[in-house]
Amino acid sequence: MYFSNANFVSSSTIPAAVLPLPSRNYACFRMSHRKIHRSLLSSSVLEFMAGRNLRVLSNSSNRESSDTSTDFDVPFPRDYFDLLDQAKKATEAALRDNKQLMEIEFPTAGLESVPGDGEGGIEMTESMQLIRQFCDCFIDPLKATRTRVFFPEANEVKFARNTAFEGASFKLDYLTKPSFFEDFGFVEKVKMADRVKPEDELFLVAYPYFNVNEMLVVEELYKEAVANTARKLIIFNGELDRIRSGYYPPFFYPKLAALTKTLFPKMETVYYIHNFKGQKGGVLFRCYPGPWKVLRKVRNKFVCVHQQQDMPSLKEVALNILPSS
């Protein structure tokens, strides 16, 4: 199995928290269908990320590790250390139940943040940092070379190799590559048959949500390299709610909309956090194998106001469950 006994306070996680700015050659990034450079991120942003990660590490050093398996009464995480530990145990439980296609989704701009609270480029950078920490604690070092981490595009792989994944043994790969029209938001899909190797056992796909082609390639990866094999696939912060909610009109994006009937029914959401703001705000939370819970914060504590076995739609939570609780 992939389970690792690594602790979050291991030395391998510390360098990733205090990284220097990358050179412009490795800083190409996608936002609003044009390239901007990660090197334009201010040093204060990286200091913020480093400070947050180091606070997580210091908090973890004061806690005793627990061998208790994930149960039905998992509390909302206190910080990102708790979150990653819960996600690790949830994924382990799903693997024991022979789940093959899994989703992990949570906000990166703060545990109680909502999409849009953070700048897109910064949120992706933080996802990359958290994915590395998840890999370090979840994947056995002996399995690292059999684990392939897919980023949205080749430039992201270059950035990862020089920052969060520097020195890592994981195989880093990409879903799309630039095309002649990349400045207009067009990319070429990568043939998964050309990327996957026979020794690969686990695929982890990082935030495949900016370009619509990215999730279509993920579907291809599942069909060609995971289905009917012993391999596993984890989609990490893919913002799949955009597809579930109809954000992409089926008339214009029929292949993407079809994923809700073809790929998503095969997928187990093993760890999930989605926040709702406002007077009737709350949280939709799930930690496998537990039920889906709707939580509300009361006097700085999260209280469960509703739970069910199947995932409710975000619209149902926002318009029905939270207002009536």
Ranges and model annotations:
Residues 47-229:
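Positively charged, amphipathic N-terminal segments that serve as targeting/anchoring signals
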Residues 152-156, 236-243:
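Short beta-alpha junction loops
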Residues 222-225, 237, 246-247, 252:
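Charged interaction segments
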Residues 1-64:
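N-terminal chloroplast transit peptides
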Residues 243-322:
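A conserved mid-domain beta-alpha-beta active-site/ligand-binding segment of alpha/beta enzyme cores
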